[in-house]
Amino acid sequence: MTNFKFTLLARSIAFALNASTAYAAQPTNQPTNQPTNQPTNQPTNQPTNQPTNQDSNLSEQLEQINVSGSTETINVKEKKVGETQISAKKLAKQQASDSRDLVRYETGITVVETGRTGASGYAVRGVDENRVGIMVDGLRQAETLSSQGFKELFEGYGNFNNTRNNIEIENVKTATITKGADSLKSGSGALGGSVIFETKDARDYLIDKDYYVSYKRGYQTMNNQNLKTLTLAGRSKKFDILVVDTTRDGHEIENYDYKIYPNKQADLSAVGPTREKADPYQITRQSTLIKLGFQPNENHRLSVALDDSTLETKGMDLSYAFRPYSQADKEIYGERIINDQSKRKNIQFSYENFSQTPFWDHIKLSYSSQKITNKARSDEYCHQSTCNGVSNPQGLHLVEEKGVYKIVDKDNKDFNYQEDKNNPWSYGKELYNSKNEKISNDVDTEGGALDSVLINCEKLNCEKKKFPIYKEKDEEWKDKYEHEDRDITIKELNGKKYGEISLKKSDSSGFTKYESARFLFPKSFGYSTDFVNDRDLNTNTQQIKLDLDKEFHLWHAQHQLKYGGLYEKTLKSMVNHQYNTAANVQWWADYFFCKKPVNGNRIPAPDHSAYRCKLMNSDIGKDTYLIPVTTKNNVLYFGDNVQLTSWLGLDLNYRYDHVKYLPSYDKNIPVPNGLITGLFKKFKSTDYVYGNKYLVPKGYTNCTYTTDCYKQNFEENLALLLRKTDYKHHSYNLGLNLDPTNWLRVQLKYANGFRAPTSDEIYMTFKHPQFSIQPNTDLKAETSKTKEVAFTFYKNSSYITLNAFQNDYRNFIDLVEVGERPIEEGSVVRYPFHQNQNRDRARVRGIEIASRLEMGDLLEKLQRFPLGYKFTYQKGRIKDNGLHPKYKEFLELNKDEHPEYEAIARKPQPMNALQPTTSVYNIGYDAPSQKWGVDMYITNVAAKKAKDSFNSQWTSMVARKEKIYDTESTVPAKKANGKEVKDSRGLWRNNRYTVIDTIAYWKPIKNLTFTAGVYNLTNKKYLTWDSARSVRHLGTINRVETATGKGLNRLYAPGRNYRMSVQFEF
C-alpha cells in the first residue's frame, strides 16, 4: 500500500514540477519520507523511489542477481540479465555459511581457491580476484597483491595471506552479483563483474513492532563448524538499534576419503606434497555488526554503524614442500605451524534527508573508515621429542624432593660416576644411570659449569631450596666424582629473580683455584629454533560519499534520476617481520640460562641458553618489499532510468573516476636498500660495491653497504621510484528495454569497465641473480566492454530468459621478461629482469539461461511447486599482440628438434578463470501453511576440456634444450600424472560430475524453525575446476607430486555431508 501511495505522490510532484509550481513543505505523514519502520534501501522488488510505471525499473535490473532480505519472489519486470539478487532469507534457507555457498547454486560465477588461505574473491567471465569488484556497504574491499612477480616470488611459499577478505554471511541483507563490466557501481576492478553486499539494518526487522530477538545455532559436518548467532533489534521513540553477533568455530573442510589414514600417528606422519588428507587447521570467525539510528522526524535520519570481524586460521602445513632439514634426525620435511588472520573493521556515519526539493527526493551523506589487515604468520621448527635441538634419550627430568631440586633419569633415579672398565683408553670416570648403563654420550659432562649457568627463579621457586651439583674435582683439584646439595643464592636483575650457585675456591697454594662442578643437562640446546615469518598486508580506506535521487516527468517521459560523487583515500602497505625465537622449549632451557662472559666478566644473559650459551632469540627488525602507496580516488556519477512509453525504456548511466597513486617511504619500515640501489641510476664502473670494505682495489671508490656513496645512490634511485601516477576513466552503462507484447521483454546492454594497476604492479622492485623485477610507472589501465542481448518470455510468475553476451578485455597486465641488464655501469654481472607491461587482449563469448516455472500456472493443484533451471556456457581466449617475449630464447633453442613448440607458443591462450559448462536444476515445495518445505538442487558441471586449459610452466616441463649461464643442455620431459608433458595444456582438470543437495525446513510453532540438509546426497567423488587450477607447479604450498598425481586427493570436494540449524525468534 505504501508503494501505491508513493506512486500517486510521485505523479503529483512530477506534474507540479512540469507546471512550474512551487514546492510546498512536505507533510510529516508522507510515505516517501520513509517512516522509522521502513528501511532506507528497500528490497529490489520494492524500491524506495518506486517508478510510476513498473517497466521503468527494468533496465536497472539488467545483468544483476540480487539477494534481498524480504522476499524470494522475482518480479520479471524488474529482472536484469546476468544479474542475480540473493536474499538473506534465501541464504538462511540454503544454510549458506561462506562465499562458496553464496554462489553454490549460481552459474557463471565461482570462488577462487587458494588452499590454506581459503577463498580469494570470485571468478566471472574469464577473469578473477582483483578483476571482479567486491563491495560491502559501498566500500571496496581489500585487493590482493596481483603482480605476477609477487606471486612468483612470495605467494607460492605461504608467507603472505594474499587473499581478498570475505564477509560474514549472517550480516548480509542483500548480495548483488553482476556479470559483465560493472565499473559504474564498483569503480576500478570490476572488469568481469562485481559482488556487492548490503548489511542488515534494524528497520528490516522492525516493520510492525518495536523489538526483535533471534538466536540461531547451526552445525555442519564437512568442517565440524558450530554456528552461534544472536540478533537483537529494538526501537524506542526516535532511536533504533541492531546488534548481530556471530561466532563460527570449526576446522578444515574434509575432502573425500578424509579418513584415509588409520590413526593419528599415520596422519601426522603423512607430510609433504603427497599427503592425501587436508591439512589440519582450526578455523574461527568472530563477527559483530552494530547499527544505531536516530530519526528525530520523518525527514531526517542520522546513523552510525560498526562492522567488526576477525577470521583466524591456526594449524599445521603438513603438505608443506620444504622444511628445515637440520632440525631433526631424518626429516625430509620439517614442520610449519601457521596462524593466519583476516581482520576487517568499518565505522560508518551517515545522514539522510527525505524532504523533496527540486533537486532531490532523497539525499544521503556518509563517511566511512575501514581497516583491513590480512596477516600470515608461520613458525617453522621441529616440535617433536626426537628433534636434535631437544634430544634427551635418557629422559632426564627435574623433580623436587624435600626442598631439593634433583635431575634424575627416566626411572626417577640418580646418576653415579664409575670407571669405564670396557674402555682402557677412558680418562677419568664416566656417568652411569641406576641400571648401570653408561650415559655419558647422552649427557653434557663438559658444559654446564656452575660459573656459566644461572637458575630462573621466576619459574622455579628458589626460596630455601637446594640443588645437587656434580663435582668432578674439589677446590684443591682432587678427584671427587660425586654430587653435592648446594644452597641457591637469590639475586635480582631488572626486577627479575635468578639463582646462583658459586664455585668453591681455594687460595692455599698462593693462587686461586676453583673446583670443577657443573649441572648435568641433556646434550642438546633444550629448544628448537623457530624461524618466524610474520607478514601483514594492510588496506586502510577513508571515504566520503554523497548520493541523491530524484523522480520526475519531463516531456511525457518518466525519469528516475540518481547522481552523486565520492572521495576515497586508501593506504596500502606491507609489514614484514622475520625473526628467530625458541620453541618446543624443554626444562633445561626454560629453568636455566647462561651467565655470559663479557670483557673478562660474566653477566646474566636470560636470552642465552644454558647449553653452550647460545642466543635463543634474534630479530632483524621490520621491513617491507613494497613501498607504501596512498590511492586517492575522485568520482562523479549520473544515472537516469527513462521510461519513454509503456513499451520503451532507456538506461543512461555514466561515471568518471580519477585515480591518483602517491607513493611514499617509511624509514621505520624500510625497503631493503639492495632492492633499490642501482635500479635506475647505476653505480659507476669505478665504484666498489660488492665485497669486503677493507679490501677496496686501488683506483676504486668504496661504495659498500654502509658508505655515504651507497646511501647517496639509494636516495637518488628512491627519488626516481617515488613517481606519482594517475588514471582517468569514463565508465558508462547503456541499456534499452523493449516490451512489444505482454509476454516478451527484449533487453540490450552496452557497458564498459576498467582496472587501474595495483600499487605493487607499478612500484614493486626486486633484484636477484635468477629473478629481478623492474618497476613500471607507465602502465595503462586494463579495460573491458560488455555487449549483451536478452529475451525474456514470461507469464504470471513463470519465465525463461535467454541471454547472449560478449566481453572484450584490453591492456591485460602481464609480467614480461625484458632481458638481462647490468647492475652497475660496465659490469659483466647481469641480472635477468622482468617488468609488468600491458600486452594481452581477450574475448569471452557465451550464453546463459535462467528460468523458473511455477507449476501452479499450469495446474492449480500444483501451487507452490516451482521448478528452476540455470545454464551457462562460455568460451574465451587471450590473444597476445605478437609472440610473447618469454618464448623467444626457448623457441630459438628448440626450433630444430621441436618445431611444434612455436605453434603452441603463438596460438591464443585459454583462460583458466572460465568455468566449465554448468547447469543447475531446482525443484521445491512450500506447504500452504508455510510450516514446512523442501528444495532439491541438482548441479551438473562438464569436464574442463584440455584445449581450454593452460599450464603457464609448460616451457620448463616439456622435452627441451635450455641455456644456463651460456651452457646449453638437453632436458627430458617431466611427467604429470604418469604421462610426459608435451604441450601447454593444464596438468590437472576436473571430470564431469553431478551433485545433488536436498534441504528442508520445519516450523512447528511460529517462533521456531528447524532447517536440515544433505549435501552431495549420492556421495559423489569430484574435483572442482577451481580446486584443480589452484595446484601450484612452483613454491611450497598447495603442491602435489606432479609425476604421479599423489596428493591431489586432498583437494577433492567433501563427500556426503550434513547441515542443520535451529532458530528461535520473537
From Swiss-Prot:
A motif (TonB C-terminal box) lies at residues 1049-1066. Residues 208-1066 form the TBDR beta-barrel domain. The gene is hgpC. Residues 26-54 have a biased composition (Low complexity). Residues 66-200 form the TBDR plug domain. It is a multi-pass membrane protein. The keyword Lyase does not apply. Residues 26-53 are annotated as: 7 X 4 AA tandem repeats of Q-P-T-N. A motif (TonB box) lies at residues 63-70. InterPro entries: Plug_dom, Plug_dom_sf, PT, TonB-dep_rcpt-like, TonB-dep_rcpt_b-brl, TonB_rcpt_b-brl_sf, TonB_rcpt_CS. Sequence repeats lie at residues 26-29, 30-33, 34-37, 38-41, 42-45, 46-49, 50-53. This protein is subject to phase-variable expression associated with alteration in the length of the CCAA repeat region. This mechanism is called slipped-strand mispairing. Addition or loss of CCAA repeat units would change the reading frame and result in introduction of stop codons downstream of the repeat region. This may be a mechanism of regulation and a way to avoid the immunological response of the host. Residues 1-24 form the signal peptide. One of its GO terms (molecular function) is siderophore uptake transmembrane transporter activity. It is found in: Cell outer membrane. This is Hemoglobin and hemoglobin-haptoglobin-binding protein C. Keywords: Cell outer membrane, Membrane, Receptor, Repeat, Signal, TonB box, Transmembrane, Transmembrane beta strand, Transport. One of its GO terms (cellular component) is cell outer membrane. PROSITE patterns: TONB_DEPENDENT_REC_2, TONB_DEPENDENT_REC_3. Acts as a receptor for hemoglobin or the hemoglobin/haptoglobin complex of the human host and is required for heme uptake. Belongs to the TonB-dependent receptor family. Hemoglobin/haptoglobin binding protein subfamily. Residues 26-57 are annotated as: Disordered.
